[in-house]
Amino acid sequence: MRYIKSITQQKLSFLLAIYIGLFMNGAVFYRRFGSYAHDFTVWKGISAVVELAATVLVTFFLLRLLSLFGRRSWRILASLVVLFSAGASYYMTFLNVVIGYGIIASVMTTDIDLSKEVVGLNFILWLIAVSALPLILIWNNRCRYTLLRQLRTPGQRIRSLAVVVLAGIMVWAPIRLLDIQQKKVERATGVDLPSYGGVVANSYLPSNWLSALGLYAWARVDESSDNNSLLNPAKKFTYQAPQNVDDTYVVFIIGETTRWDHMGIFGYERNTTPKLAQEKNLAAFRGYSCDTATKLSLRCMFVRQGGAEDNPQRTLKEQNIFAVLKQLGFSSDLYAMQSEMWFYSNTMADNIAYREQIGAEPRNRGKPVDDMLLVDEMQQSLGRNPDGKHLIILHTKGSHFNYTQRYPRSFAQWKPECIGVDSGCTKAQMINSYDNSVTYVDHFISSVIDQVRDKKAIVFYAADHGESINEREHLHGTPRELAPPEQFRVPMMVWMSDKYLENPANAQAFAQLKKEADMKVPRRHVELYDTIMGCLGYTSPDGGINENNNWCHIPQAKEAAAN
């Protein structure tokens, strides 16, 4: 006991770091490295050593930084780190849970009864047993020489600060080197993998729950700020729900860089959409995006017309359709192969999982960052919400460059392909790879539809922008005033299940959609808000839905008046 009292705060931090970093992460180490014995390589061995060291050093780095608040505050904060990590380790060990935004959001719910349902006697016993030793160390130690004390003491400043900085560098540098090595493998194989550092951060204590907690806090602050600054259509307008919406599933697929003039269903010479061509309940439109870059389009494509400024940065003025549906009683989950966190938080989704977090799931470890991973997440979401009135948002990588990385080898139908970023591909090679990626988009959308084919469901798809693929111009993101037309060409689709069409009003709305699609009526991003509301059957007596933008609007009354 005397030794415990006498050791410095720095030594105690290191002992705690070993306990939290190694012992509490034991189950994760076993799952991540258990298969290495059967398929061992030097790089796998190096990554195992790096991750073991990183979990210890990042915890040490954190505990030393917390000592900047002084002895008393450090004891409290360090105790919280131990307790939170011990609690998280229970679910990671016995339930194989990946601690991410969704878990933190669930823990932070105001519905205490629901939170208590996942806390049993075994959890309490584990929490006590695992946290007892480190808590005894923390509260029986004198906490001599905190970082705050050392920085105030001449002769100790440089050395104490250097130790902390060195710990941070020893975490960052090896992980960065392994990330670079992984990128080389990606370029050589054409396989897209999640960020190595991101997966590590989302896999281990305490960085997983700390990053998720930070994301949750940022989302709450951002949401609160937006609630105060953005116009809320759900409060400004009256939305009247149809009688049969409570058992409905809504899925919105946000496409990436896919062009309608490279899709077979729109008359393209190559059959890039064989599966969608077989969907009888699909209405597909030649669409035009509101901008030419993902971040900009996400600002303007899901708000009411005029809900984003017409300035270069597309300043938001109103809340988006997903936030409105949330306020109208829909539960919602968002799964993304991208990382536009500002947009994801603005949807007010109950659960958000982005690419690194999805890649850290045990079932996905070692797999490419493939849009099909979102289908697995969607299955989980549907299973958790068996009663309907549920929204699922899927943000894909679609046909984003490098096109060849967007699809597995089995979809390499057109060759030669464009391999690598710096390979100086010809236009024909780029088009071959791009068209292969479109075929995989077709496969993905069809797979999503399969998940809700037997449910009362409606599925929307819209790509965020188009792409230039020619000798003069490549990619996208050209300022919209100067952008060529192909950067605005996006497919937009609506699919309704047979059960959804059993309702006469929905069947009538779909007939209108098919009529407009057959007439090749062009559609725009700015019509999505009103279309989603209208196709779900919502009405607004005070202007909350612009019927001119509602694709499902039946213009009978207008035609009668004209006659």
UniProtKB/Swiss-Prot annotation:
The keyword Cell membrane applies. It catalyses: alpha-Kdo-(2->4)-alpha-Kdo-(2->6)-lipid A (E. coli) + a 1,2-diacyl-sn-glycero-3-phosphoethanolamine = 7-O-[2-aminoethoxy(hydroxy)phosphoryl]-alpha-Kdo-(2->4)-alpha-Kdo-(2->6)-lipid A + a 1,2-diacyl-sn-glycerol; alpha-Kdo-(2->4)-alpha-Kdo-(2->6)-lipid IVA (E. coli) + a 1,2-diacyl-sn-glycero-3-phosphoethanolamine = 7-O-[2-aminoethoxy(hydroxy)phosphoryl]-alpha-Kdo-(2->4)-alpha-Kdo-(2->6)-lipid IVA (E. coli) + a 1,2-diacyl-sn-glycerol. GO terms for biological process: lipid A biosynthetic process; lipopolysaccharide core region biosynthetic process. It is found in: Cell inner membrane. GO terms for molecular function: phosphatidylethanolamine:Kdo2-lipid A phosphoethanolamine transferase activity. It holds the Pfam family EptA_B_N. Keywords: Cell inner membrane, Cell membrane, Lipid A biosynthesis, Lipid biosynthesis, Lipid metabolism, Lipopolysaccharide biosynthesis, Membrane, Transferase, Transmembrane, Transmembrane helix. PANTHER family: INNER MEMBRANE PROTEIN, KDO(2)-LIPID A PHOSPHOETHANOLAMINE 7''-TRANSFERASE. This is Kdo(2)-lipid A phosphoethanolamine 7''-transferase. It comes from Escherichia coli (strain K12).
